[in-house]
């Protein structure tokens, strides 16, 4: 800083040591007065990029039709699962329906995450997670906007807002339609809420989801998946879904919805018959989520005498198909040896 010095007709700017020291003190004071609330912005992580799925957790697939083991279903959630018939997906209006937000953690694909800034202020407006062929895209709004009314229309992707907690992005999704928790086995209602935590550790991204549903769940259901950054990633191919005639009976009877009436699901005892899992365990519930549930089963579980499914041996070759043994020579044909050699 300078001081003006006037001598006769001349004017000089003279630097004063006292002023420089004062300026240094003012600067130091300003640094100490910076609000602590502004500091977490430096800790916010960059989540953008292509992320490949790395985890080997339960991906939501089930070999048995009725497999609610480990799911905290309520009585209504169990009734919904037992009434469901997967043939309903062959109805024209259901063939192209998408999975709910939980599919981000249970689906087979990776993530493509990008950010959206205000074009003038460059302030972060939202994080965007691209959709797949059977999952809607997710926009995580970071500008503080409120969630819509509970009466607002619901979509497959829902409405999501986010905030930073330290270096973790916490996102809450509401207003999504009823959909699968475990693919084609159990379901979440349109009153469910999904809370995500995105935490980055170098080139690894841990995503934890907590699903809460007052209708079909008796307790929150927790899912976790790990993704790894792929610096050479490319976009996910999105293909159009076109309904076709899969089951003629459904197209001949447009109002028909395949289902099971109470007590009529013929697959209810499948896990018990194939794997020896007691029926009360196969029907799920909060207790089946926890390791100590093994103590409940130890007196009732009996290992099947012989393996019935997933026995570790390759399936038999189809008769006459690829991999089938060559046909035996035809006696007196004269060409049998040649045909067998081929």
Q: What are the roles of these predicted feature ranges?
A:
Residues 7, 15, 32-35, 331, ...:
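N-terminal non-cleavable signal-anchor helices
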Residues 3-5, 38, 44:
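N-terminal start and proteolytic maturation junction detector
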Residues 26-38:
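Bacterial N-terminal signal peptides
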């Amino acid at each position: 800083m300078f001081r003006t010095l006037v001598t006769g007709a001349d004017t000089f700017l003279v630097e004063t040591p006292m002023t420089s020291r004062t300026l240094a003190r003012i600067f130091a004071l300003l640094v100490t007065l910076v609000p602590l609330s502004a500091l977490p912005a430096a800790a916010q992580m960059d989540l953008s990029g292509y992320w490949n799925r790395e985890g080997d957790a339960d991906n939501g697939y089930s070999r048995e039709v009725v497999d609610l083991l480990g799911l905290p279903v309520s009585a209504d959630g169990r009734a919904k699962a037992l009434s469901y018939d997967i043939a309903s997906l062959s109805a024209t209006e259901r063939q192209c329906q998408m999975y709910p937000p939980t599919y981000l953690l249970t689906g087979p694909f990776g993530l493509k995450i990008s950010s959206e800034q205000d074009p003038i202020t460059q302030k972060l407006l939202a994080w965007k997670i691209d959709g797949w062929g059977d999952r809607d895209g997710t926009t995580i709004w970071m500008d503080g906007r409120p969630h819509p009314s509970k009466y607002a229309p619901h979509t497959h992707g829902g409405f999501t807002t986010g905030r930073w907690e330290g270096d973790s992005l916490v996102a809450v999704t509401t207003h999504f339609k009823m959909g699968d928790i475990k693919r084609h086995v159990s379901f979440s209602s349109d009153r469910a809420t999904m809370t995500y935590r995105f935490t980055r550790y170098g080139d690894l991204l841990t995503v934890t989801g907590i699903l809460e549903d007052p209708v079909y769940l008796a307790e929150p259901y927790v899912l976790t998946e790990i993704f790894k950054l792929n610096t050479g990633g490319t976009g996910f191919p999105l293909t159009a879904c076109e309904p076709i005639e899969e089951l003629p009976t459904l197209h001949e009877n447009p109002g028909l919805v395949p289902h099971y009436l109470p007590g009529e699901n013929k697959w209810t005892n499948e896990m018990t018959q194939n794997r020896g899992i007691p029926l009360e365990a196969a029907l799920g519930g909060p207790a089946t989520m926890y390791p100590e549930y093994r103590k409940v089963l130890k007196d009732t579980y009996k290992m099947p005498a012989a393996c019935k499914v997933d026995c570790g041996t390759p399936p038999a070759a189809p008769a006459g198909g690829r991999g089938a043994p060559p046909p035996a020579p035809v006696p007196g044909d004269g060409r049998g040896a040649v045909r067998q050699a081929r």
